[in-house]
C-alpha cells in the first residue's frame, strides 16, 4: 500500500484525475470503477477538464459505479445516477450510454439486481482502476463494519452513522435511504488497481485505523492491505500523525 500525502484536497483530486485520464488515454477500452460523494466531486471536475482539453475519445470506455441507494428514482436529486450525470456524463457527453453501469436501486427484486450486477462485473471486468472513498467508520462502498470479506454485490442495510453522515445531502435525516445496492468487498478487490481518497479531519481516524490495525471486518478498509496495488491519497487534514 502506497500512501500519498498532499497539501490539499484540490491537489490530491487533480493527481487522481490525472491517473484516470492516463488510463483512458493509454487504454481506449479502459474499465473504470467509480465512486460518488463530496470526496469525488473535484476528481471528476479535473478529469472533465482534461478530457475536454485533449478531446479524448471515450466511446469504448466502460464505467462501473460502486453503489446506489435503494428506493430512489434515477432522476432523484440525491441518487447516484443523478450525481454521476451532473459531475461527469453531462459535462463530457461522449460516454456511450450502454457502457455506463450503475446498480438499479428501484428493482422489484433487489437480490436479483445484485446478482445481475455482480455477473456484469465478472463478465465485463476486471476493472482497471477502482476509486474509493472511506467512511468515518472505515466502510468502503457501502460495506459497513462487520461485512463479510467474501461478499460480492449485495443489498446493504446502512448503519446509523452512515445515515447521519449522508443526511447533509437531504432535507432531513428521515429522507435518507436505509438500504443500498453495493459492490461487495470481494468485488472491489478484483480491480487491478485501487485508489482510495480521504480528505478533511473527519477522515483522520479512519485513515489511522486503516494504516495501523490488523485486517479486520470491524474496519472494512483494512482488507485493502491484501491487495497488491493500492494507493491512498490524503490531504494534510486527513493524514494521521504517523505520516
UniProtKB/Swiss-Prot annotation:
Catalyzes the reversible isomerization-deamination of glucosamine 6-phosphate (GlcN6P) to form fructose 6-phosphate (Fru6P) and ammonium ion. It holds the Pfam family Glucosamine_iso. Pathway: Amino-sugar metabolism; N-acetylneuraminate degradation; D-fructose 6-phosphate from N-acetylneuraminate: step 5/5. It catalyses: alpha-D-glucosamine 6-phosphate + H2O = beta-D-fructose 6-phosphate + NH4(+). Keywords: Carbohydrate metabolism, Hydrolase. It comes from the Bacteria. The active site is at residues 67, 137, 139, 144. GO terms for biological process: carbohydrate metabolic process; glucosamine catabolic process; N-acetylglucosamine catabolic process; N-acetylneuraminate catabolic process. HAMAP family: GlcN6P_deamin. NCBIfam families: nagB (TIGR00502). This is Glucosamine-6-phosphate deaminase. The gene is nagB. One of its GO terms (cellular component) is cytoplasm. Belongs to the glucosamine/galactosamine-6-phosphate isomerase family. NagB subfamily. The keyword Hydrolase applies.
Amino acid at each position: 500500500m502506497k500512501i500519498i500525502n498532499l497539501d490539499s484536497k484540490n491537489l490530491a483530486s487533480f493527481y487522481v484525475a490525472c491517473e484516470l485520464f492516463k488510463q483512458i488515454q493509454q487504454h481506449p477500452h479502459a474499465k473504470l470503477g467509480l465512486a460518488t460523494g463530496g470526496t469525488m466531486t473535484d476528481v471528476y471536475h479535473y478529469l472533465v477538464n482534461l478530457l475536454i482539453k485533449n478531446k479524448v475519445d471515450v466511446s469504448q470506455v466502460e464505467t462501473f459505479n460502486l453503489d446506489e441507494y435503494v428506493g430512489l428514482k434515477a432522476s432523484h436529486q440525491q441518487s447516484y445516477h443523478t450525481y454521476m450525470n451532473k459531475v461527469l456524463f453531462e459535462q463530457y457527453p461522449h460516454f456511450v450510454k450502454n457502457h455506463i453501469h450503475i446498480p438499479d436501486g428501484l428493482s422489484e427484486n433487489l437480490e436479483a439486481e445484485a446478482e445481475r450486477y455482480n455477473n456484469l462485473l465478472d463478465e465485463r471486468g476486471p476493472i482497471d482502476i477502482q476509486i474509493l472513498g472511506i467512511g468515518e467508520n472505515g466502510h468502503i462502498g457501502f460495506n459497513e463494519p462487520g461485512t463479510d470479506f467474501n461478499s460480492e454485490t449485495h443489498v446493504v442495510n446502512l448503519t446509523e452513522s452512515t445515515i447521519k453522515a449522508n443526511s447533509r445531502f437531504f432535507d432531513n435525516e428521515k429522507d435518507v435511504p436505509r438500504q443500498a445496492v453495493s459492490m461487495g468487498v470481494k468485488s472491489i478487490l478484483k480491480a487491478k488497481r485501487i485508489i482510495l481518497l480521504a480528505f478533511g479531519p473527519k477522515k483522520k481516524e479512519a485513515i489511522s485505523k486503516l494504516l495501523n490495525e490488523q485486517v479486520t471486518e470491524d474496519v472494512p478498509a483494512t482488507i485493502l492491505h491484501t491487495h497488491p496495488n493500492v494507493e491512498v491519497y490524503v490531504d494534510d487534514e486527513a493524514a494521521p500523525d504517523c505520516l
